[in-house]
Amino acid sequence: MTTLLSIPHKQILDRRNIIKGAAALATTAVSVKAASAATAPPLGQTGAPTTASEPLPLGPLPGGRYPDSHLESAKKGPPSFGPPDFPAFAGTMAVERVATGFRWAEGPVYFAAGRYVLFSDIPNNRIMRFCEDDGHVSVYRQPSMNSNGNTIDREGRLISCEHSGRRVTRTELDGSITIIADKYNGKRLNSPNDAVVTSDGAIWFTDPIYGIGGYYEGIKAEPEQEKHNVYRVDPKSGDIKVVVDDFVEPNGIALSPDEKKLYVIDTGFTDGPNNPSQIRSFDLDVSAGKVSNSKVFADMPKPSITDGVRTDTDGRVWLSVGWGDPNEDGVRCYTPAGELLGKIHIPETVANLCFGGQQRNRLYICGSTSLYAVYTSVQGSMKP
């Protein structure tokens, strides 16, 4: 059933720029090398070349021995399997590079019906598609308005946060695009970054200024909003309201599996060394559309920051880590109480992550120029 979010600001984009449905997507599947080939920048593109460097090799990361040395538990355990409370540490789990050749991979989201991952390649102004069953990679949309974070709503529609569009959009099942939010109090948003959808259909999103700071990941512009807020879009009226206004740079956002907690990352450290590099948790009242009881869930080891966040069905919190010590690049896993369980080491700066796979236990990781994957022993909460 379509919510009234489809009513305000509806805009149909050129159908030539939209590849509709899983069947149409399949016809565009190309090799990783072909997907990274240079193309002329279409209208709205930043003009950045569509190749970054020589693609990295695919497959398991170097090491070739179980247990995979890229999986590190915070606690000591049996040498082969490790402690059971870190669900990415088991005898035959291995980190794999499944696609490469991008410029800055971000915002992965898994579509179970088609068994594919969509993710943004922000500077190249495109959304990519990784087909899980055969490993093919294709361009899902170009231009993408320098989309960053992506999620999926309860009706299976793609929700995207666009830098150069400075808006949140929804791709309808017929391929048309609806603008969900582009202004607050009559002024343009900064550059929406990441979003989640609660069970009532409300869309919650973050709005830092990263996409308007220059021409690499968007279009340089002056911010019109005084603060960098977290917003909620009402599922019935389409009204937009501020739910949190005290972040330096709100970034990744996620829900606990029971929707009683909202997690929001603050990457304010990128604006100055005295600013936070942390993730905060809030008590969430979905029906009231409000949050309360803000707490620091975890601090990152500066100068590293966390960018993306997901949860599993047991309430563990999975965070991307990068931009600081290369030894910290990767993913961190925490208990619901904020205790560090373990790390997944990735040889590139990591921006974001999502769970996917037929059993919802495969963790996909966007690491700079590549998409990585590792099987775990838990299931993602699959809350978008």
Question: Which residue stretches match the model-derived regions?
Answer:
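N-terminal secretory signal peptides
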Residues: 1-17, 24, 39-40
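Blade/loop signatures of beta-propeller domains
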Residues: 51-93
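A short beta-strand motif characteristic of beta-propeller blades
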Residues: 96-99, 136-140, 178-184, 240-243, ...
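Beta-rich, blade/repeat-based domains predominating
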Residues: 100-116, 143-162, 167, 185-205, ...
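Short, solvent-exposed loop/turn segments at conserved positions within beta-propeller repeat blades
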Residues: 123, 164, 213-226, 271-277, ...
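A short loop-to-beta-strand structural motif that recurs across blades of beta-propeller domains
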Residues: 126-128, 167-169, 229-231, 278-280, ...
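Asp-box/WD-like beta-propeller blade repeats and closely related beta-sheet repeat scaffolds
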Residues: 172-202, 208-218
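Short loop/turn segments immediately following beta-strands, especially the blade-tip
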Residues: 282-289, 376-381
